[in-house]
Amino acid sequence: MGTVPATRCVRGFSRAVRRRSPFTAILVFAVLLFQLACKSLTPIDTKPLDNAGIGYSAIKELKAQHITATEVSEIAKVRQAGLSDEDCVTLLQIFHGRGETFTAGDAIASLHQSGMSEGTVLALAGMDQVGLGYGELQAMHLAGLSEAIVLEVARHHAAGTPALSGASLGTLRNLRMDNGTLLELVRRGIPDSEAAEIIAARRHGSTDAEILRHFSGS
């Protein structure tokens, strides 16, 4: 008989815990929501933007685009590399327009510091060509290939269509082929599989005009 009250007590405690469980879950959920709300209301520290030389109106525009703490440091890199306030705002618009976080600060800074113009850098960003493959485009520019060629190669990459590689174009440039001829070969969509033949023809004395006549593309 002495064990019955103890059993009833345990059962009563279990029922009490079960009754409190929904309330406990709701309380925990409410606390989490409160923490998230506080975090979202915490103002972004834009001091790095100010230190990078970005003006008040541009910072205001960046805030209006809901710039994140991570993006603040990336945009600061771009501004420190010499791009304008307007360029910084445009870059954030481009990435957010694709539903992406702006993480290309190093790539864009490197491209611009290599001598590439603001317009070309922005165009590459618009084509989503400032990711892992940007190094080839930068190397092409440093090899003396025109920005028009760099952009045309980037367009083919973005479209997934054939184009001569940066290495092949650099070799042809070293063989004194004109930038205009190289641009036309890229426009024609000459695949890199034909590069060896073009290089051999050039080394055997073929002129720019002869090469353009022979390699008509698709």
What are the functions of these language-model segments?
Residues 24-35:
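Bacterial N-terminal signal peptides
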Residues 37-218:
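General marker for long, soluble alpha-helical cores
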Residues 1-19:
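N-terminal secretory signal peptides that target proteins for export/translocation
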